[in-house]
Amino acid sequence: MTGLLEQILHGFNVFTLGYFIVLQLIFTLLAVVGWRAIEDYVERRPMRDYRAVAESEMSMPVSILVPAYNEAPSIVASLRSLLTSQFVEFEVVVVNDGSTDETMAALTDAFGLVKVGRVPRSNIPTQLVRGVYTSPLEPRVVVIDKVNGGKADALNAGINHAVYPLFCAIDADTMLDADALSRLVWEFQAEPETVAVGGIVRIVNGSEFEDGRLAKVRTPRNLLANLQIIEYLRAFLGGRIGWSKSGMLLIISGAFGLFRRDVCVEVGGYDPTTVGEDAELVLRLHRHQRERKKPCRITFFPDPICWTECPEDLGTLVRQRDRWQRGLIEMVVRHRKMLLRPRYGRIGCVAMPYFIFFELLGPTIECFGYALFVLSLVLGIVSLPFALAFFAVSLTYSLVLSFLVILMEERAFRRYPGWSDLIRLTLCAVVENVGYRQMLAVVRMRSWYTLASRKQHWGEMTRKGFGPLLPGGVGAVPCLDPTADPVLAGEAPTER
């Protein structure tokens, strides 16, 4: 019996080692592609006239969709911030999804909302819309009040009432850089076959605000928040850019993405029966366009910045990651027919297998790998020197990738101007490998068991908001002065 156990453990250890090597090779390839893409972007950035896109009446107008559920502390500040976007023509459609707090009252008080008879432009099924409101103080504001149906249902209601050909889906607790819309719209106008573009999401915890706008980017003092900053940088700069440049991007963050409205209406909008409605929509767009032999460019752009609050307590973080993993499982299961089908190109033959074997099964393999590796060490199947060497190699490789994305951030964007911020992030890149990453692997593995028992609902998190509201009026007048932004002026970021 002992001999059989040793054979099983030895076989699993060999499998785990091979799995680890393949995964690290994929990460390396994505990081190399991402680095080259960042270098290319930095080189070409001065040639992109985002100011012209922001000011031109020929630019494609945008409907910003903001689904909101119990967002009273931050919704007014978020909306006023969105209204300062440097873009010629846009509307902000806030969808109050049956909030039980003062979200609707806060919007009414701030903008003097008046109920109107606005006819929807599409008929994606949603929960009952109780009323549509506009603001005589700010004509770009539209508020939809509806029965609760979840985030996807709220977004579908927003799509139905949006009047422009592009819609930008963002979370109610997020803040956009002033020129974010013009940067994303550039992609649609430069490449007409573009169906969707995702922008990078950054963590705002610890930063300073002035008049409801982000004044100074700082890293937070909270350890969990700093660990998530490293995660986000690695996911977006070290992974998503690589997938995008390879034509295999499957995920656009629900916090910030720009889509062609007509194509999304064709596929039926967001799926309200899944918790991962954002990723599921992207995969459905790929599938829809390929099945009809239509061009489908879905890409990621690293510069338009969306700022969001992240969880600062363990309970909220665990619930968030469980929800994300369940959404990923649902997405892959629903579109499993795409797997290894040449009809779907690299999406079906490369991206889908990766997500199944490394994103879905990865946490389970990782957790069992830890447990069986320790058991092998106890039984003497694996020697202590080998175990220590393997741990050292794994840690070193993880640190190299984390340091690389920090370097990429510094090379291209320099959003963290202080040396103390960079030192804090560097230390967190080390700390996350001891306990934090393993904890998240357990949470993601557990998602298989929570999937069947969970109903679709909003993921709630305590918000701190974005500081004081803009003084006076409803929103500041957008400033299109290129000197306010070094990139708009065609200049590189200033030296520290």
Regions found by a protein language model. Give the residues of each.
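A short, conserved alpha-helix in the catalytic core of glycosyltransferases
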Residues: V263-E266, T274-F300
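Long helical/loop segments within the catalytic core of UDP-sugar-dependent glycosyltransferases
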Residues: V116-V142, V147-N156, N160, Y164, ...
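A conserved acidic beta->alpha catalytic loop
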Residues: N96-V116
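Cell-envelope/extracellular polymer assembly enzymes that use nucleotide-activated donors
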Residues: M60-S63, E91, V265, E280
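N-terminal membrane-anchoring/stem segments of glycan-assembly enzymes
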Residues: M1-M58, R240, L372-L375, L401-M408, ...
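N-terminal signal-anchor transmembrane helix
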Residues: L30-E89, A105-T108
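Short aromatic/hydrophobic "clamp" motif used to bind/position activated sugar donors
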Residues: F167
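Membrane-embedded multi-pass helical conduit in multi-pass membrane proteins
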Residues: A54, Y354-A452
